Design a protein with these regions (language model features):
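A compositional signature for long Ser/Thr(±Pro)-rich, low-complexity
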Residues: 1-344
Length: 344
């Protein structure tokens, strides 16, 4: 766990609207465990911030879950793209109280899974999308990547969607929770640089245009998979939900001097990474979902509680968030309430 900021404390985001007040109600770990075991697990796909969200789930659900892989034999760490899972702990007192579906295997069926995917697609797929945008013109590079590209971790949606839709006992996922935008930069995708302005940094509009097309292709693909017939036991494809969590930029300057929450979201005053573009990218993903018109794909604008919390960052930087600050914990609570609403 990353060291906490010395003035950081847990803060709860409580909605003011009477209609949304219930989303501020606390959710016990027992309620979360019951939902994950009986109604279906959560599959988290994204970058290092999503990985932190996964880690926070292990804390929220302790001692009722066992996390894998075991990093101890590997010196305490491993490849960043290793699959990570939370399984129901056989010694949990809740085991005898739960009623999981037929076919659920306590040793094989994850409650929560994380896969590191920075750019939604694997490189060859993203290259194909980019070339199709330009009608395979010779004026654009053959690849967005290349030897000068910064490191990113990627996986084809064919792979992670096949995991998401797999039947029991291998899987029983109800929710696919996806968030992306932070690695969509000219560092990760140097082939997207404007040839007339190759020095342009992460805010190059060509990256944004590629992102807009990529999320359009992605939402269409995901919607198609959800319409496919289900195989085997478990949550049916028609019952699954794909939730796009608004991506979260960091805070400018020295966030570690902040002593508490802000009263309003600060506008960016300079070009830090691609942070000033994140809002537009979130809106692009939201628009792609709306255009698809599939009620199983939904956009969750959960970024504001974190945008108001520059004090909640870990000491390492002003992007990653301290476990226990209330941000990730609030996301889990909101998603639980959201899924309960859909069941009502």
């Amino acid at each position: 766990m990353t060291p906490a900021h010395p003035t950081e404390t847990t803060q709860d985001w409580i909605p003011k609207s009477p209609v949304c007040m219930m989303y501020g109600e606390q959710v016990s770990r027992e309620q979360l465990i019951r939902a994950l075991a009986e109604q279906g697990g959560w599959f988290l796909v994204g970058n290092s911030v999503t990985e932190q969200h996964f880690f926070s789930m292990s804390c929220l659900l302790y001692p009722h879950v066992i996390a894998t892989p075991d990093y101890a034999p590997h010196g305490g760490s491993g490849p960043r793209d290793w699959p990570q899972n939370l399984y129901l702990n056989p010694s949990s007192p809740l085991v005898d109280q739960l009623k999981p579906p037929a076919g659920f295997d306590i040793k094989r069926t994850p409650l929560v899974t994380f896969r590191r995917v920075d750019l939604l697609f694997e490189p060859s797929e993203l290259d194909a999308i980019h070339l199709s945008m330009h009608n395979s013109s010779d004026s654009v590079p053959s690849t967005l990547f290349g030897p000068e590209a910064s490191e990113s971790y990627n996986l084809s949606p064919d792979k992670y969607l096949s995991i998401f839709t797999a039947p029991l006992p291998e899987a029983n996922y109800k929710v696919l929770l996806v968030s992306t935008a932070g690695h969509w930069t000219t560092a990760s995708l140097p082939g997207a640089r404007d040839p007339s302005d190759v020095q342009k940094e992460a805010t190059n509009p060509a990256v944004y245009k590629t992102f807009v097309e990529a999320v359009r292709v992605w939402t269409k693909k995901v919607s198609g998979v959800l319409k496919e017939p289900s195989v085997g036991q478990g949550v049916k494809n028609s019952e699954k939900q794909v939730l796009i969590r608004a991506y979260l930029p960091g805070h400018e300057f020295d966030c570690h001097k902040e002593t508490g929450p802000l009263t309003r979201v600060r506008e960016f005053t300079r070009e830090w990474y691609n942070w000033s573009w994140i809002g537009r990218m979130n809106e692009a993903f939201k628009a792609a979902i709306q255009a698809q018109g599939n009620p199983q794909l939904r956009f969750l604008g959960l970024d504001k509680p974190a945008l108001l919390r520059p004090d909640a960052h870990s000491l390492s930087d002003c992007l990653h968030i301290q476990i226990g600050a209330g941000i990730f914990e609030g996301w889990a609570r909101y998603i639980w309430h959201f899924m309960e609403d859909l069941r009502a």
